[in-house]
């Protein structure tokens, strides 16, 4: 029995936990709404369930979702929650009017003046106190909006306070309008830096207010939305993103118009271009350094300045890429996607096929379309040429891109530095830091483009051996390549065995597919963790800090490491891992040999036992203790048979021996 103080402490902890967290069911009861409405409200307000640590999971339960009580209490007086309750009351009035046949009252209730509507203006101001915070969420917003912009609506409705399970006509029109405004801004401001064509669609990257924004535009084709998807969740995100992008685009367009007006005024007055369409100084990305600022702040400002200068160089190379060129896009090519790249790089898109006004024709056919004549002064290229020029920031030779020619590989600029410039290398390093599993392999096509940009360029690793080693054995996952041997499985090797393990055989060895078993203690720990649902529990804070410090130390050592030292380190790691693999193979072979010996010895011992049994039976037959039955197929114990006959003569029954219990070796609960 627990002490009074211990019981009181447990009670206080439990009450404190109840005050701090609420379950989803408690939150819906507090707000007096259904779970669907509660989930939609949380999406709009940016409230998500909290991950609890192990001690709190034990006293609360594993299958429940918990929210901070203070965040749920904020929703009690929220205007969106009040509008949802008002809409529920309005629905009851409409049903009553329909049931009673009051057409005039029904007409008044369904008018836009009476029907409740909610506004997300205050919510957007709460979630994004600074404009740069909203810019950082534009990538997810534009990917979602572009997805629904080409989907056909299924419900005719202009309001979003209802819970729709399919795309409405009002949201579809707003999504198309936002996409057009965003493409227009990117083309006017000329902030597009990269592009890539993939199976999923068209990837773009733009630098807006000092932030890299990447979004995905899907391929437009006949579609059918798959069943079984809760669309109201995605539509809730879409509703919020549409409202957010209105504010973002208004701010960007007004800043762009102001900068263009200032630039024109400066050109008219002084004849010198002072401002560009995109001014990073007005982006609010940098802070002014005071005179008494410490060294850490100075270092941060210096890093931000270098980042800003690299982005400025990147944009300067792209903005005048297609200057003076006019492209005609054939009808089989999606004109929106390629017109965005051409306009953002300073080129023009022709609407009519007039050879005197055109320099390039973009065709995605093995031959020219019917009715179009070929002219020698024009270049007829395939669509990939536009994106490859954008990524290389250079007008590439059209050889290999003409109609009917086999295209070169289309390399993603997000994982490989195509130009090998400082700004591209910095961007790729940041991507690798955010996504550690990206392999830094440089294809041969990238070396060709780098040679075109800089004739003095020479590839350090043209065959990609170092990149192959990095992809196969990374520093963070080197322990996964070879399973660690436990103490009970480890066996000391002699000198001859080590020499045999190091010797490279002339034949190809059979791969060891045997699974290495966990030790009993480790297996028991894993079992207990699974029972307590702690396999995916959050990492301890001390352990997380230690891992973060180790990771930072590894990154620092990598930055100061030369390419030769890196190659030597990778080769030594490979040799060490090969030795460990050979050691493991030898240990597995030893275990296989032990099992084979055990099997052979069992067969030999069984044969010996059988021979001894037969010899004993022959001896007993010779002594008369056993004799054959009448049919000659069995043996009978002479003494036992005599006792049975005497008992039968006295009309008694001989007590038979109990049969052996086959479950004798099993535990009692099985019997």
From Swiss-Prot:
Q: What processes in GO biological process is this protein linked to?
A: maturation of 5.8S rRNA from tricistronic rRNA transcript (SSU-rRNA, 5.8S rRNA, LSU-rRNA); maturation of LSU-rRNA from tricistronic rRNA transcript (SSU-rRNA, 5.8S rRNA, LSU-rRNA)
The Swiss-Prot or TrEMBL record annotates one GO molecular function as: ribonucleoprotein complex binding
**Residues of the BRCT domain:** 317-403
Keyword check for rRNA processing: yes
Q: What's a Pfam family this protein contains?
A: BRCT_2
Entry superkingdom:
Eukaryota
Principal subcellular localisation of the protein: nucleus
Record flagged with keyword NADP: no
Signal peptide range in chain numbering: none
Kindly give the SMART domains that the UniProt entry links to this protein: BRCT
Coiled-coil blocks? 548-584
Q: Which family does it belong to?
A: Belongs to the pescadillo family.
The protein's role, per its UniProt record: Required for maturation of ribosomal RNAs and formation of the large ribosomal subunit.
Q: What is this protein called?
A: Pescadillo homolog
Lineage start = Eukaryota, Discoba, Euglenozoa, Kinetoplastea, Metakinetoplastina
